């Protein structure tokens, strides 16, 4: 059985004061879908953090986690290079989404090992 290589780029974040999920999610979906449409990512998901009594005390403060799934590191690296070029479409989508997020967002990259 051939294993599928998966790479996940995730961001943990909170919305700026006064910004609702309802107004934010369409902008986030448009930004994440762009990476699929461009052929970099294969899927995405957006999760809302739920409190778990007695756990998570050492984690940074965040409300949401967005995850873009790539088939391999090469596609993830290509997507990162694409963003660094500051093209008009990706920059516009990023600014529209990012303007609603608190500035303390953080990001991490994971590769599936099992």
Which residues does each PLM region occupy?
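Glycine-rich beta-strand-turn "strand-cap" elements at beta-sheet edges
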Residues: 1-3, 45-62, 88-114
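A broad, low-specificity signal for short, low-complexity segments enriched in glycine/proline
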Residues: 4-7, 24-31, 69
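Short, well-ordered beta-strand segments in beta-rich or mixed alpha/beta enzyme
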Residues: 6-14, 45-85
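Alpha-helical interaction segments
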Residues: 13-15, 34-35, 53, 97-98
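A generic structural signal for ordered secondary structure
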Residues: 15, 32, 68, 83, ...
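Short amphipathic alpha-helical segments
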Residues: 19-47, 86-93
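Prokaryotic Sec-type signal peptides and long signal-anchor helices
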Residues: 28, 35, 74, 111-112
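Secondary-structure boundary/capping signal
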Residues: 40-43, 74, 105
